[in-house]
Amino acid sequence: MNDRVLRVLEFNKIKELVKGYAITKSAKEMVLDLKPYDSVYDVKEHLEETKEALDILMRKGNPPFEGLYDVKEAITRAEKGGVLSIEGLLRIGNMLSVTRKLSDFLARKEEEEEHRILEGMREGLIVLRGVESAISKAIVSEDEIADSASDKLYSIRRSLKEKNSSIRDKVNSIVRSNAQYLQDSLYTVRGDRYVIPVKAEYKSQVPGLVHDQSSTGATLFIEPTALVNLNNEIKELMLKERAEIERILAELSALVYKNIDVIKVNFNIIVELDFIFAKAKYGSDLGGTMPIVNEEGVIDLMDARHPLIPKDKVVSSDIYLGREFSTLLITGPNTGGKTVTLKTTGLIELMGLSGLLIPASENSSISFFEEIFADIGDEQSIEQSLSTFSSHMTNIVKIMEKANNKSFVLFDELGAGTDPTEGAALAISILENLRARGCRIMSTTHYSELKGYALKTENVENASVEFNVETLRPTYRLLIGVPGKSNAFEISRRLGLKDNIIEEAKKVISTESLQFEDLIQSLQEKSIKAENDAREAAILRNDAEKYKNRYKEKFERIESVRDNVYADARREAKQILDSAKEEADTILKNMRDLERMGISSDARRKLEAERGKLRDKISDAEARLQKKKEEQKGEELKKIEVGMEALLPSINQKVIVLSKPDNKGEVQVQAGIMKINVKAKDLRVAKETKEEKKIKKREARLNLRQVDPSIDLRGMDSEEACYTADKYLDDAYVAGRGEVTLVHGKGTGVLRKAINDMLKKHPHVKSHRLGEYGEGGTGVTVVILK
């Protein structure tokens, strides 16, 4: 596809909008490289992947991309065997975490619809729990290794804390004993060594090493001799800490290198998923649909909207071309909205052929074209000193050199910028030449000659954009089959031109021309009325179809529930009777054995006892059946309230009461997705089953496990981070967590401030603080919940 048409139809603006939904830099680059695909197979596959992603968005919400960064640079470094930075390892760890979460997110349950393309991509994801766990255990933030990264590091840092505590006690003692010689009563640190601010004139009173001085020279920063050994010990521990951190980074980098091929594959799949879901999110916000793609040159767009015009201002139109006619001429006055229709059609074609959902109703069709050409707008170059006509003709010449039967050609004001008679003749000749090649053509014009050409030429159709003479503005609704009317006289009258001048002008025009314009106006009025009638009929037809399907679904649901209830009852009754029969057979066998033993007094007693057992067993079976019937019937409701839960025995299902009893004694209830009317006296008290109680208890136990003790907000803007944190705090509070950690990173501090402001007003928060050394420092906030 030529770059000029992408620019002229503003496809680049669409890509910028889609890019805003992508997360990784690599996915954003994929969006910017997006253009129509070269084969109809590729077009259909990429549309299908976008539709699958939209289905998942609608059913499951946004995919778990939180905390994902582009790790292309880190992977490149790891491939060469280099040691990765803390930040690089953290990002790879986050990417592996996203891999695991995405694999779970995209897993299909049995009852869910199949998503062939995305499920195939999911199968390519390989979860590396060991690598992910090793990195997350060792790294706290972009610049901090956790104490628990190794036993040695833990030991070193514990010693560091002890030494720092000792030296602080020592230095405070020195400060107190030398207060008269000091510029300030506070110690400070220079070059990782504790020093005190001594007045220059008293330097001999405080023996030690001078490390620095103030800008005025009045203060010397001296390391007292008594602190030298302690400072040396701290320095040694810091060197050991640095060496251990470098060893840990090298070890983790080696682990990444060992799994680099899998990590690369995972990252490439995640980037592609990021790209696909960006398309789907844009399509969702646009209200887009997946078009039907054909190769016959047929365009059939229902309720098509220009995607760059705000929703509250855009007007939809039905646009079709390629079945009854191959060329559509949109005629009418300048500034009449014709160009918008032209751009809408071309841009929707580009979007669909690039795998994007289109702003049109379901079942709209686009055609696969090898090339789309457009001559729209006045793009002449001042440097080239080209006139409007010359500029357009230069573009048209290039189009004529390349267009074929697989091309869609768009002309804006074909033949304009020169003598009207010559321009119209040239336009007709160009259209005829392209039609002979089999091109599909849409062109705008205000020449009357082209209206006549369309009326008398086979496979060429007139169209116009409806114009409101009262407001002097186009409505932007396309009327196919009706040529455009200039409205020059009526517009002039509305603007205040005197009637006598208008009447004189009409005398100049031939009677045939005036009659033709009047005929056009009549056609427009009839076309608008017919279109409005057709729309109303379509709405009524759709409503009727919805009601038909809704009641059919209700009937099938009731039939299914009733059959299931009967089947369950028969099955349970059979189980009870089978059990009773089995035990009765055993008792009868025992009785026959006793009879064979003879009729001794002892045998008679045993025989009578077995008969008693048989009677008891049969009575018990009958009682159980009766009890089951009573249970199914349930306790009658004494009072009916709207919103209460009740049992409807006829379908053996719990329902929600939606209305009070009417004069017939009926109430409306909701059973699942159905709303039905039943007798109030048929409702029973709904009791919670043992199984439901078990499920609730099990869910309560699982809640705590399902909410992580921390959440990563890095990479989000303030608004998204506050929203995500707010939802997480709600979940953590419900799950019973007492303390959680919000990871926001250090950065510029903007995100940290926004989170802090949100926490001050949050109803579940008891208190909060910044993390301490080893917890993530100022890169995290620890929250205590109420």
Curated annotation (Swiss-Prot):
Say yes or no: keyword Hydrolase present. Answer: yes
At the top of the EC hierarchy, this enzyme's class is hydrolase
Provide the Smr domain boundaries.
711-786
- What is the stated purpose of this protein? Endonuclease that is involved in the suppression of homologous recombination and thus may have a key role in the control of bacterial genetic diversity. Acts as a ribosome collision sensor, splitting the ribosome into its 2 subunits. Detects stalled/collided 70S ribosomes which it binds and splits by an ATP-hydrolysis driven conformational change. Acts upstream of the ribosome quality control system (RQC), a ribosome-associated complex that mediates the extraction of incompletely synthesized nascent chains from stalled ribosomes and their subsequent degradation. Probably generates substrates for RQC.
> Per the similarity annotation, which family is this?
Belongs to the DNA mismatch repair MutS family. MutS2 subfamily.
Q: Which residues form the signal peptide?
A: none
The top of its lineage is:
Bacteria, Bacillati, Bacillota, Clostridia, Eubacteriales
GO terms of molecular function: ATP binding; ATP hydrolysis activity; ATP-dependent DNA damage sensor activity; endonuclease activity; mismatched DNA binding; ribosomal large subunit binding; rRNA binding
Protein name per the record: Endonuclease MutS2
* Covalent S-S links between cysteines: none
Q: Coiled-coil annotation: which residues?
A: none
Q: Which organism is it from?
A: Clostridium perfringens (strain SM101 / Type A)
- Which of UniProt's keywords are assigned here? ATP-binding, DNA-binding, Endonuclease, Hydrolase, Nuclease, Nucleotide-binding, RNA-binding, rRNA-binding
Q: How does it assemble?
A: Homodimer. Binds to stalled ribosomes, contacting rRNA.
Q: What is its EC number?
A: 3.1.-.-, 3.6.4.-
State the superkingdom. Answer: Bacteria
